[in-house]
Amino acid sequence: MKSLTKLLLLLPVAIPWQVTAQQRYFAEKSVVSFFSDGVVEDISATNSKVTSIFDAHDGEVAYLLSIKDFQFVNKLMQVHFNEKYMDTEKFPKSSFQGQITGFNLNSTGKQQVKAKGKLTMHGVTHDIDVPGTVEVVDNRLALKSKFIIKLSDYDIKIPQIVWQNIAQQVEVTVDFMYRPL
């Protein structure tokens, strides 16, 4: 009887913790890529070492990436990107911290969501509000988003000699696969 009483007293405390724990997700080796439609040539790169955490209970989401992990087809572009444009020695990371709205863990199929929060890049932080989708796939969550950022918003300067080669706006694609924690 004492065991049953203890169990019943602990149950209200244990169940919310278990539910909350099941609603936290972690993504590693996820992908952020970008594409710049230049007049002379297109520029694109992919970072497949991005880590992210998502709490499906309250919608909190955050990701962190290392700028040096962006891979280019042309290695010289990668060197210029890190040294001349992104100043990776001074600003080695980019991050996002915010909230995803419009997501229901119990729904099936792709759900249209919004991510609203603070994107930090090149030492500058701006509020962003971007569309995306979340889909529950085999107890994992697939989050995808595509949005445009202006380089000038993040104080990324393009030298006058190559400004025609590089678009002032860059398309960013996010592709995360979360697993339960």
Give names to the regions the model predicted.
Residues 1-24:
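Bacterial Sec-dependent N-terminal signal peptides
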Residues 21-181:
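Low-complexity, acidic/polar, glycine-enriched regions of mature
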